[in-house]
């Protein structure tokens, strides 16, 4: 929205609030930016979120929840729970329409992601025990349900992926589905609010396959192997250059934006080889001005032809689900 504002869209913003729960914080952030974008820009998204959590749950608990919410958003940035099926509703003309497919991740990364979600889920549960009774419903709806249901969704899909390859029992995936159903029942019934939000939350919207128990089927192709890199950086790991950090964006929250005709520099130890492959990961988007978004690289002073990474067509949906597009040079 700051990009929209800086591009001159300053009179009217339109927000679709059809699915208002559990997006209360996001709606508040949007409205605060619409009311006084300079105030939000000055304090930053992290501090704005911190103020929200402390207002709702007290200073001590709010501060403890801040890193949990940031990690929740970071993991969801990599892949939202509803996109974990690695399929797309518009693919009705293909042979794998509505068929849950492997995520393009190695066993090592899957285990790392599952461990991160388990830690998050445990911390959220511990914090719940410190919430006063009159705030338990708010805590469940704003924090506990989104974080724990996301964790269980990842467990359901990723344990199923491992089970397809004979690396895990199917029981863990099935148990995660049951946990999502149980959490949703609590959301709708509540603790002390007389079922105020009864039937508000549905854990199987449109009865799409990604929200159902995963079919017990064996994989027909091997799981992806972990790639090995000579060097690997986040955007903000550059040694020098002209850039601005993008708060909250990127798989490690270290994405940057580079002004037109500016550059950043990265260094790595020399290697004995006649060629290298450079893989650049970027945020998928459309041009704000002009008809293309281009990036150019040079290696040891040798210019590599510019590449246009504007995303469009069916492939753009794949990029948007992963919050990244890539250029291989």
Which role does the model predict for each range below?
Residues 304-314:
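Solvent-exposed serine/threonine-rich low-complexity stretches and specific carbohydrate-binding patches
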Residues 290-301:
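Short, surface-exposed beta-strand/strand-loop-strand elements in extracellular ectodomains
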Residues 274, 286-290:
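A short beta-turn/strand-edge loop motif at beta-sheet boundaries
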Residues 1-264, 268, 272-279:
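Substrate-binding groove of N-acetylhexosamine-processing glycoside hydrolases
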Residues 318-325:
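Conserved small/polar residues in nucleotide/adenosyl-binding loops
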């Amino acid at each position: 929205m700051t990009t929209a504002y800086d591009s001159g869209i300053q009179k009217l913003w339109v927000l679709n609030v059809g699915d208002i729960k559990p997006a209360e914080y996001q709606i508040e952030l949007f409205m605060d930016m619409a009311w006084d974008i300079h105030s939000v820009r000055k304090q930053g998204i992290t501090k704005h979120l911190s103020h929200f959590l402390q207002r709702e749950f007290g200073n001590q608990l709010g501060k403890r929840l801040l890193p949990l919410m940031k990690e929740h958003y970071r993991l969801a940035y990599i892949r939202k729970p509803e996109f974990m099926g690695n399929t797309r509703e518009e693919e009705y003309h293909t042979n794998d329409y509505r068929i849950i497919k492997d995520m393009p991740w190695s066993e090592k990364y899957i285990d790392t992601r599952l461990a991160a979600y388990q830690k998050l889920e445990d911390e959220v549960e511990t914090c719940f025990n410190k919430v006063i009774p009159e705030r338990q419903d708010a805590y469940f709806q704003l924090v506990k349900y989104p974080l724990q249901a996301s964790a269980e969704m990842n467990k359901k899909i990723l344990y199923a992926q491992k089970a397809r390859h004979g690396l895990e029992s199917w029981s863990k995936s099935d148990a995660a589905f049951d946990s999502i159903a149980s959490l949703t029942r609590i959301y709708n019934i509540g603790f002390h609010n007389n079922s105020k939000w009864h039937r508000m939350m549905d854990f199987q919207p449109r009865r799409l396959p990604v929200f159902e128990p995963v079919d017990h089927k064996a994989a027909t192709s091997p799981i992806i192997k972990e790639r090995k890199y000579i060097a690997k950086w986040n955007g903000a790991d550059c040694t020098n250059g002209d850039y601005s950090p993008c708060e909250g964006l990127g798989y490690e929250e270290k994405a940057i934006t580079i002004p037109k005709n500016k550059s950043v520099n990265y260094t790595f130890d020399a290697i004995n080889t006649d060629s290298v492959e450079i893989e650049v990961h970027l945020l998928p988007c459309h041009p704000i001005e002009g008809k293309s978004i281009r990036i150019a690289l040079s290696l040891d002073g040798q210019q590599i032809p510019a590449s246009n990474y504007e995303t469009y067509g069916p492939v753009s949906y794949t990029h948007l689900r992963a919050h990244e597009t890539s250029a291989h040079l």
